[in-house]
Amino acid sequence: MFVDNIRIFARAGKGGNGLVSFRRAKFVPKGGPDGGDGGDGGSVILEVDPHTNDLRSFFYDPKLIATDGVGGQSAKKHGKNGKSVIGKVPPGTIIYRSNASSMAEATWLEREGEGIELEKIADLTEIGTRFTLCQGGLGGKGNWHFRSATNQAPTEAEMGTEGEEGVFFMELRRIADAGLVGYPNAGKSTLLGDISEAKPKVASYPFTTLQPIIGVVEFDSFRRCVVADIPGIIEGAHNNRGLGHEFLRHITRCKVLVFVLDMAGSEGRDPIEDLQNLRTEIKLYSEDLAKQPWFVVANKMDLEGAEENLANFRMRFPKVDIIPISALNGDGISRLRNRLDELVGYKFIR
């Protein structure tokens, strides 16, 4: 199961109350105030974890609850702080705060068609980043703090403050340098397996890829890039047909788009129409995404009719950068890897 968006409830701990207490000891019948401070409530924290691939950990238990701080004690002893809770999220997670005060209210708003207002509060892309989703409440001060020359026996102490809470939406947008875009059965999964260490499911029927898959492409001289393969796009994807939005959002961070076309025209497809339609879907979904650099991978060049279709394709799109390949037998893969290195390759330290 792959989960790339989820609604959760989060609540930080309440601060412990300060204590009203007076020192009582042998030979000290009227000791001064000694009430300690309450402990701070635990916070709810999100941490970007490189080993977390999606948001499935929140699917069956969509809540993060921190513990309350403990009240102050006598002898000026500070109450124990509440324990913070840390939720692991993958790189590329966007956090939204909703206007719903509870999960029940959020469900009601959705069911009644009222709509939920969302405020973007974080875009977590850097590994190791910690983001405080809900701040724990502060512990109250004990009566020891309220002593004065005119009030040596204060009976006042502070209450701990409430911790923050709310309903939040988390959305995963994969982080990749290049995104493979194409129709179902265009050969994207086979291609990703050829150029990287990814092991996507491959079969000769459409929609083999049912979730975004990330592959790391290693080059010479300690260089690499990250490539995302999203499930095949269909007409109307920009309107969320076929869960288009669920898939397209995973390539919004890509620096270059790679349109993978079945140049042999298998299943009666026309490569020229395919490119035009794919470009249209991308533009209708996001003008900014459509402005990103792109090139075409002409796949299935080992099949009958591919050479003739490629010649017609070049005549129709004379300025488009085209790399002919056969993902099945490996022809053209080296040239594709070189192009990716030129466009988005970067140095890394092992």
Swiss-Prot record:
This is GTPase Obg. GO terms for biological process: ribosome biogenesis. HAMAP family: GTPase_Obg. InterPro entries: G_OBG, GTP-bd, GTP-bd_Obg/CgtA, GTP1_OBG_dom, GTP1_OBG_dom_sf, OBG_GTPase, P-loop_NTPase, Small_GTP-bd. Keywords: Cytoplasm, GTP-binding, Hydrolase, Magnesium, Metal-binding, Nucleotide-binding. The keyword Nucleotide-binding applies. GTP binds at residues 182-189, 207-211, 229-232, 299-302, 326-328. GO terms for molecular function: GTP binding; GTPase activity; magnesium ion binding. The gene is obg. Mg(2+) binds at S189, T209. It is found in: Cytoplasm. Coiled coil: none annotated. It holds the Pfam family GTP1_OBG.
